[in-house]
């Protein structure tokens, strides 16, 4: 058989098994673990390439015969479940139809079943690109609809959160309260090119207000200290969530007025709960809310302002708190409230706990102490900072950082999908799931996606001057594509609701045109179901110094003064 050098092969078809890829300007390197294509039978689009009539493209099978709608060729997949692999990815009916070898089985060996390329198939050349699942942000304050565009520009295509616009309640809490508001927001998000699931208000001792919100269409309850995060509110929202099979998210009581962290853990009664702000700078029992990350029933996340921990983190957080929670810098009690939440010791520990797989998810806390367009960026910056601070993880092979990278990718893809009950639809690159995918140039991985595929259609991309003679001339901006236009946006985006709402006919009653899918399996999961982030060590916090110990070992790191993929990548 004819042979070519590894370097020449990489130039033609991209890297293969054993090749390594540097991610951006970080010190993180991934290595391809396996290649699902056949050497010498690669599917390649272009002039003089193999995907031509009668060659790699079948010229007699129709779409009714199962031909793909779209194929991404020779791409490097980075997925928390699959690992780091090389493959073609086939898309059909807006879903992932196959991962393996695409082409024409009439003339090619080893074509994966369901991955026939034909006249009905378009192609994206993935030879020198990385493919991930689209990001999921589980902590969205629905303050402004423009958040969706900024999130897509950093590879996030699903929102879970609440609000009704720039009210003070929405600025401070992630809540869409009551059936009328819920209905209007379900109708409003029809115009956004992202998936959306809405959180209702869980601060209720009464059954009626909780039940009516579940039937109206929420995917979960948010219990927030600004509305009173009492033990009774937690117990009753969790009990109703058990009945409805929806999630409960909590921002606990910073002032410890309603009890301490031990009382909140007792109020959980062993039930599954998603804890926002697990570190506490964004809110929660001062100074030791971080202890909840040790509980097997707690699905812990934290938000991106403190990730990675930098020399300016403490200073900017104070002003964030004052604005978001309607506080007055001239009132000493308000100042004390804000200062109680900002603790460099626990912020440092938060970064370490992410690296250890103890805190399982990243989110933004959009416009309410977090940046909606920086989730992937902060994920990779934190991974890089932790490698510099803590060295290689014991799970990583000597020559690559695959495990660490996959641990961090899981925090923004599959784990929030599991936590919110949508992992049967999105969250990973797996056959049968919705084709919500992001393509990255490795030089910009985590910072700037090349394009976002939403439900099988490109709906967001870096695009040059529309009046130019090519797609590439400057100025290159992120722009909406055809997948984000007209009725196609409705076909390719999902509104998630409770099963009770779906059974009650929320789609018809609210006049929704988008896909409407019920969340499920929210109440039967535990932290041990979270991918690569399932650790439950003992966590202690010194009440005087705020030092955090994990299984008796001090968990800390120094703040960084330089971040990867920062000023080199962005103007300003």
Curated annotation (Swiss-Prot):
EC number(s) given by UniProt? 3.5.1.5
Which protein family is named in the record?
Belongs to the metallo-dependent hydrolases superfamily. Urease alpha subunit family.
GO biological process entries: urea catabolic process
Q: Which gene encodes it?
A: ureC
Q: What is the lineage of its organism?
A: Bacteria, Pseudomonadati, Pseudomonadota, Gammaproteobacteria, Enterobacterales
Question: Its GO CC terms?
Answer: cytoplasm
Q: What is this protein called?
A: Urease subunit alpha
Chain's role: Expression of the urease operon increases the likelihood of bacterial survival by contributing to acid resistance in vitro and in vivo in BALB/c mice. Y.enterocolitica enters the body via an oral path and must survive the acidic stomach before being able to colonize the intestinal mucosa.
Q: Where is the Urease domain?
A: 134-572
The residues that the entry says bind Ni(2+) 2 are 222, 251, 277
| Organism from which the protein derives | Yersinia enterocolitica
PTM note says:
Carboxylation allows a single lysine to coordinate two nickel ions.
């Amino acid at each position: 058989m004819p042979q070519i050098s590894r370097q020449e092969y990489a130039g033609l078809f991209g890297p293969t098994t054993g090749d390594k890829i540097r991610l951006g300007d970080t010190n993180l390197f991934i290595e391809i673990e396996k290649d699902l294509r056949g050497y010498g039978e690669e599917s390649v689009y272009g002039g003089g390439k193999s995907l031509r009539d009668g060659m790699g493209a079948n010229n007699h099978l129709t779409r009714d015969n199962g031909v793909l709608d779209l194929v991404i060729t020779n791409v490097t997949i980075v997925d928390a479940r699959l690992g780091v692999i090389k493959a073609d990815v086939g898309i059909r009916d807006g879903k992932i139809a196959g991962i393996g070898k695409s082409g024409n089985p009439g003339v090619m060996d080893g074509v994966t079943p369901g991955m026939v390329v034909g006249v009905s198939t378009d192609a994206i050349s993935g030879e020198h690109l990385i493919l991930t699942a689209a990001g999921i942000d589980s902590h969205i304050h629905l303050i402004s609809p423009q958040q969706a565009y900024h999130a897509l520009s950093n590879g996030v295509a699903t929102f879970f959160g609440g609000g009704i616009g720039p009210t003070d309640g929405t600025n401070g809490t992630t809540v869409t309260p009551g059936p009328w508001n819920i209905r209007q927001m379900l109708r409003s998000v029809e115009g956004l090119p992202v998936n959306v699931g809405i959180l209702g208000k869980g601060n209720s001792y009464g059954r009626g207000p909780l039940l009516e919100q579940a039937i109206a269409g929420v995917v979960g309850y948010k219990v927030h200290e600004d509305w009173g995060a009492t033990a009774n509110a937690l117990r009753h929202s969790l009990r109703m969530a058990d009945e409805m099979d929806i999630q409960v998210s909590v921002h606990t009581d910073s002032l410890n007025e309603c009890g301490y962290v031990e009382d909140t853990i007792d109020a959980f009664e062993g039930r599954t709960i998603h804890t926002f702000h697990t570190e506490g700078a964004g809110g929660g029992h001062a100074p030791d809310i971080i202890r909840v990350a040790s509980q097997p029933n707690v699905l812990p996340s934290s938000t991106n302002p403190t990730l990675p921990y930098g020399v300016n983190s403490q200073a900017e957080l104070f002003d964030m708190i004052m604005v978001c929670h309607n506080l007055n810098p001239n009132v000493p009690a308000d100042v004390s409230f804000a200062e109680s939440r900002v603790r460099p010791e626990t912020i440092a520990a938060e970064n370490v706990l992410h690296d250890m797989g103890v805190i399982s998810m990243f989110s933004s806390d959009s416009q309410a102490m977090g940046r909606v367009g920086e989730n992937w960026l902060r994920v990779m910056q934190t991974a890089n900072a932790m490698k510099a601070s803590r060295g290689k993880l014991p799970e990583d092979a000597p020559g690559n950082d695959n495990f660490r990278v996959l641990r961090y990718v899981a925090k923004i893809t599959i784990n929030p999908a599991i936590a919110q009950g949508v992992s049967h639809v999105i969250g990973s690159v797996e056959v049968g799931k919705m084709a919500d995918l992001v393509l990255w140039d490795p030089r910009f991985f985590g910072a700037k996606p090349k394009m976002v595929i939403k439900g099988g259609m490109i709906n967001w991309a870096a695009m040059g001057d529309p009046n130019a003679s090519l797609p590439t001339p400057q100025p290159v901006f992120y722009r909406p594509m055809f997948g984000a236009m007209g009725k196609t946006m409705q076909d390719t985006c999902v509104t998630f609701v409770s099963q009770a709402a779906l059974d009650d006919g929320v789609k018809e009653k609210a006049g929704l045109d988008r896909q409407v899918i019920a969340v499920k399996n929210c109440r039967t999961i535990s932290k041990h179901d979270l991918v690569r982030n399932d650790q439950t060590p003992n966590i202690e916090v010194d009440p005087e110094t705020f030092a955090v110990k994990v299984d008796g070992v001090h968990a800390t790191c120094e703040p960084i003064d330089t971040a990867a993929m920062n000023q080199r990548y962005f103007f300003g």
